[in-house]
Amino acid sequence: MFELLFLGTSASAPSVHRGLAAQVVMVKEYRFLIDCGEGTQRQILRSGIGFKKLNRILITHGHLDHILGLAGLLSTFIRWESMEELEIYGGKAALDRVYDLVHGIVLHGEEPPVPIHLVDLKPGIFFDDKDFSVSAFPVTHRGPG
């Protein structure tokens, strides 16, 4: 059975009651974080699900309200040494922005302490388990990313 947890549902800017885009899909032993807007770490802590096994991040598009939370989240993962590797999935334009954020700001040109895999998605299945699969499809959204 799938469980979907909405961490943030606001757009462009947070509101008093809503954080920026972030959801977690939990199925079996897998957890997929979909988008990572600012405030995602706080929302994860408030939800009680914790950070363990949160090593697959799916980015719907590269707008800042969907990726800026990655900086703090990755910084926490690095500080806590709680991750063996991290996979970030997205389209090329989104991953270009994620790369700049991760390598330019978070790591500041240093090598990551754990492998960080930026996976350029093409339409179709990209994650396949015997009981479920995850597919990518193109989205049209205004602006770059």
Language-model regions, residue ranges each:
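Binuclear metal-dependent hydrolase catalytic cores
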Residues: 1-145
